[in-house]
């Protein structure tokens, strides 16, 4: 079994899509190990998005991610959980996401694209450590 971090971003929470997103993961055979609705502050986001801190969109990203609560979760599956989750999420830009993916079905704009999922096993471990250090 391996795990990955998923964040249902503020737009997913505001639009009432968290239950649908969780159901999709469960219907795919994945399990929720931990979940917490939390407000994300700039300090936590700077650690989580360390690779984006110097990019021009970083300020807008922090403003969006901290505007209202997000559902932060650890999802577990038999293998390649991060890859399964990312496939289910769809492309970063909802307009480029296939129907049947979370972003393809519910996404509206690239800057508010509903979900974050770790992009590798290493990223999953690092990100889980940020939000759920007791699970590492």
What does each model-identified segment do?
Residues 1-136:
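Non-catalytic terminal and connector segments of soluble metabolic enzymes
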